[in-house]
Amino acid sequence: MCSFTITNKDTLLKDTNYLSQKRGPDSTSVKKINGISFLHNLLHLTGDKVHQPVIEDDVVCVLNGEIYNYQLFGEFDSDVQCIIPLYKKYGFEFAKELDGEFSICIVDFKKSRLMLFNDTFATKPLWFAGQENDWGVASYESSLKLAGFELPQKIAGNHAWMFDLQNLDIIGEYTIKEFDLNQHKDNYEDWIEAFEISIQKRVSNTNKGIFLGLSAGYDSGAITCELLNQGVDFKAYTIMSNENEDTVEQRHSMLENGEMIYLGVNEYYEVSGYLENDCEDFFYKDRYKNYDIKEDKASMGLGAICGRANQNNERIYLSGQGADEIISDYGFNGNKIYNHSSFGGLFPKDLNDIFPWHSFYDGTQIQYLNKEEYVAGAYGIETRYPFLDTQLVQEFLWLSSDLKNKKYKAPIAEYLEKYNFPFEEGKKTGFQAGSNLV
């Protein structure tokens, strides 16, 4: 995880960097190239430590996030180093070759191009602002506002944009990932294999500590089970608010490193105060509900976990985000568990009838994902999203509707049953960190 701010505006970028710098506590680099200022904050997790921006000839790039398949493209010391060679080989559409969680900005001075790339589910924040002849691109909205831009816009996921560097006219764009909606697979084996690979790629090639929040639910249970299967060194934290204690205790008995947290009133409000001042704001209006991460009690629970992880030098957080939005739509068999469910989790014979449903890309996908990103980012921690792996999502879409509808969160349930990992069948309990404070 990193963060960046880029602008042609004459401003001192370090004055815009207070919140953004928390995402990249290892180093901050600032360069001015042909009248454009580049600021990059680095959290070093993968490969050799490479400062950004990366410059090759007349092309400059910055990366926030991870490219998991970078070693397929050559002998690179770090993932960011593959970007410009791929751009030179494939052109503007090079991002279709990437497997990762990323936001990327490239400036090609020779061609007078500004290019932005955001991964399939916009897992890494990216904001843009234009004002008369000035423009800015940043990981955080606050950086652009502090630079004097009035109305920054959040860049949507699964897209690439090309702008003329002189007048900001859009001269190219495309969708990075096109999903196939043919529901033709009649077993869960390929989904399970894709899930195992999704975990493996997110825990490899790093010496940083790995952790997750472990509840009694399906999603964190599956991640924990697979980490155990792969022999990964990790820590699991549980906020004992409204969790099923029997299930949680069974799970923790299987761990070498776990902590059950009975969150106190004082700590809850200490975390709330820290997030109020040191976490980026995120408000999102939606047709189902509006959202403010600083009013979400789950933010305080995640903050309490990240504070402990930070002290233990654990820098990689594996999140279960996306499973509810994609695999269940917050419902089952047509019954909505929450009102923001689009179709009650009853998948039709033809996915074209509903795809993309609201929370696939939008709604709680954006709201809760950015809660994960911004809260963890305030502690210098990178969030990774196994359930938003594009191949895993594709494998789910390929499952027949009968397999999707067989049981609640069917492929995850199948996986947990395969490995006899304890879980509450058919149960969905939201993360209510403000409940049962001690």
Describe the predicted segments one by one.
Residues P53-V54, L98, Y330, I381, ...:
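Short clusters of hydrophobic/aromatic residues that line enzyme substrate/ligand-binding pockets
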Residues M1-G273, R315:
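Cysteine-centered catalytic environments shared across enzyme families
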